[in-house]
Amino acid sequence: MITLKVNDIEVTVPRGSTILQAAEKAGVFVPTLCHDKRITPYGACRLCVVEDRKKPGNLIPSCFTPARDRMEILTETPAVLDAVRTQLQLILVNHPLDCPVCDKAGECTLQDLVIRYDIAEAPFGTERFARYVDRRSPLIERDMTRCVLCGRCVRICGELQGRDELEFLHRGYKTVVGTDGGRALDCDFCGLCVSTCPVGALNDKLFKDRTRVWKIRKEASVCNHCGLACRADFHLEEGRLRRVTPAAPAAGEKGLLCARGQFGWRAFESPSRLGTPQVRRDGALREAGWDEAVNHAAKALDAVRRSHGAESIALLTADHLTTEEAAAWAAFRRDTLGGGPIGSIQAGGYRRILEILAGARGARVAGGTPRDLDEAEALVVLGGGAAELHPVLKPLVNGWMRKGDKDLAVVSSWPDTLTRRATLPLTVAPGLVEEFCAELLEALGPERTKPPAELARFGIDSCALARLSGREGTTLACRYSDGPRLYLFMPFLLDEAAGRVAVQVAVTEGSYFDTTAKTTLGWVVAAPEEPAAPRRDRPQQTGGPPQKRPPGGAHRHIGLDHRASL
């Protein structure tokens, strides 16, 4: 750790932090246009300059300059303010003053900086270079007349999404951002470039010209297109959804959404969706109120239960139940109906995995977070199509692998996006991925083997993995026999069987539903624990299935987020 002063405010930051990060921790504003916490510093805009009191007159770009111990940084000296104003005036030379018709007005970083630094006129006049507006994409409009060449869209596409769809074209005064050959966008349409653009150069076509940002209010929520539960901001105008944007990244997060999350919101307002309950009368479905529909269903179920018993009523769950819905469904089955079988459309090969989890003795299976992936040395993806089912996983893995010597293993029956990047692609026969995963979980179980002390903290027993009946687990065990910090990701449980597993665990085991957990990305499998005193920081359970302490000591904690993701 190092200690320095920013505008006479003392702040301590980890060694290797930049001056800009130190200023942010001290609560001191430093202007930027090209900086985005999700990507590497670039230093293109030169607005973030600061001055070192010990070296007066020497302006330092704070976004990529490492902070040093006992520095004394000043951000509002006359030299700094003059440099910032001059740079803003130079940027405005080729930026049109069309704020009244620009969709970015009201949330434009350049507009905010011009007002903050009182830029009343642009003294540097020159003939504007005629750029272009590309409207060929169905979702993203690129208006290069407003581009300030900060490079954020170019870098975020390459560093996180791994597509390098955008690049700098030409040189000098004629430099523009575009695609190779000037073609239309042909990418994943993740919307990262739109979310990072500080001006109105990249626009969401579903939102453009439909309203103004000061007329909408933001509601923090999560995307519900898959089980990753990415945090998102829903922009509403008079109760109508206008757009969805990634939420500001918190610690350990990247602030990501995929194409479905950012541009698929119109599905929520489809006229084909049911808006009110319907009750069948005289052979036809007719709209009804909620009270009438609930009473109608209750009478029908009660009549069947009285005539044929509770076991005659089978419950079939949906695959995208939230944790709260799963808990309510389980309570309804247990307390109201008094029993009855429960199942899901996607039972498949997941039953054995559920049985292994339900039969664990003292094992702790906890939900992971992006922070866990950042700290991992190795990532094992169990099941194919992870990036296709959950597109946000792709930029997460790309960003993780750029941080150094990382090991990616993918167990799949077919090549997919992550398989092409894997350092250890493992192929199993179609239909046997679930069987392989079950064998892996069984090998990790405390009843089967006891992990060596040096590997216990990783929850991995490589010796047990090597005994997986000649399956690819042997290769996996040899690969990680030195005990790297391993992170497991099981995409199939996040989607098809998540609801069923959640309900089954709730019904058969009464396990704790951790609805306060952060976003769950996968499973971090830990070693058995010794019995411990109850945690004082855990909130008291107010509803849902009762908690049980399984045999063998430690409480089995199955971490679920509110998208029912294990």
Where are these regions (language model features)?
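Eukaryote-biased recognition of intrinsically disordered, low-complexity regulatory segments
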Residues: 1-7
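Short, structural beta-strand-to-alpha-helix junction motif
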Residues: 3, 17-21, 66, 322, ...
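Short strand-coil-strand connectors
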Residues: 7, 53-55, 499
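Conserved short loop/turn motifs at secondary-structure junctions
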Residues: 10, 33-38, 143-146, 176-185, ...
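Short, contiguous acidic and Ser/Thr-rich linear segments
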Residues: 10-17
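A basic, amphipathic helix-loop patch mediating RNA/tRNA/ribosome contacts
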Residues: 19-53
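Fe-S ferredoxin-like electron-transfer domains
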Residues: 46-189, 194-222, 228-230, 237-240
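Catalytic alpha/large subunits of respiratory electron-transfer oxidoreductases
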Residues: 96, 210-545, 563-566
